[in-house]
Amino acid sequence: MDDRTAVALFDDFVHYSNDRGLPIEGVAIGDESHIIAEHHFLSDRTRSIYSHTKSYASTAIGIAIGDGLLTLDDTLDDVVDGDLPEDADPRIAQITLRDLLTMSSGFGDGFLMIPGRRAGEGCPDYLSYMLHKPVAVTPGKDFCYSSADTYLAGRMLEHATGMRLGEYLWRRIFEPLGQGWPVWEHDPQGHAIGGSSIEMRLTEMMKIAQVFLNGGIWAPTGRRIVDAAWVAEATSRQIDTPPSNDDGWSCGYGYQWWLSPYPSAYRADGAYGQISTVLPEQGLVVAIQCPEGDGWERVVRHALHERLLMPLTT
């Protein structure tokens, strides 16, 4: 799609959102190398991108896999060197990195989510807390969205690389993209949550989507960040997601990337509307950031779908 058409549709969405007072902080559209258009309804700021973080964390894992430090078949048992708690469910040893990346660990509930963490869930030791949980279903069988799965995947990366997740992410992703040290939520023992709460500005947040749009290469410098094969695999349907009436939740899930209801499209997606959608056939990325807790998230998501993403892809 040419820039002029994309900008016209973008401007229409901005005017529509302004006219209706939709609670949006900022929205941007770009290709693999630059921002085509950007609008801030409020002053641009660094803010939590919530579960959009998961796509950054899984990319770090994809890099480690490309380096031969991990495989998708490595098991959670490796993190504790085969020394599971005596009362642990024996099926925990069967949970693979693939299961964690596809939200199919088998724990059967959403653990270490925002409300739980704020209430002290998992303290003081998140890893021990999860290793004492029963496995409800066979690992790898059913999708169940849980930030605990991403946290455990991050602990597997730390075990394999000998680095904290934040350091590895900075060295292999943030620094090459020209970004600073990741400000991130950590557990009481200093391990990054993995699945939530990196803080970024709008156009920083969407950089990982621009890298994926370009097959793993950061176009402004020509530097490869992650293997093209990982980009293709991570953004392909790896597991089915439950039926939903909302826009885009039932299209399937990759490795911490949601599939979207547009041709070949996928997205990194965080609570309250922190979203970067990749539209490969149009060569575009659309990113949006929204405020917390106002109850309008579904309205904004639907408007984004109807007024910008659908017109861009039809």
Give, region by region, the residue ranges found by the protein language model.
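Active-site helix/loop module of the DD-peptidase/beta-lactamase fold
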Residues: 67-107, 132, 160-200
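Catalytic tyrosine of NAD(P)H-dependent dehydrogenase/reductases that use a Tyr as the general acid/base
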Residues: 50, 143-145
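Active-site Gly/Thr loop motif
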Residues: 181, 232-286
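Active-site-proximal alpha-helical segments within enzyme catalytic domains
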Residues: 152-156, 196-218, 274-290
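Flexible glycine/proline-enriched surface loops and loop-helix/loop-strand junctions
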Residues: 42, 134-139, 149-151, 187-193
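Structured C-terminal helix/loop/strand segments within mature extracytoplasmic catalytic/sensor domains
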Residues: 270-314
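Active-site SXXK
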Residues: 33, 48-73, 100, 153-157, ...
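A short, well-structured edge-of-sheet supersecondary motif
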Residues: 9-43, 276-277, 283-287
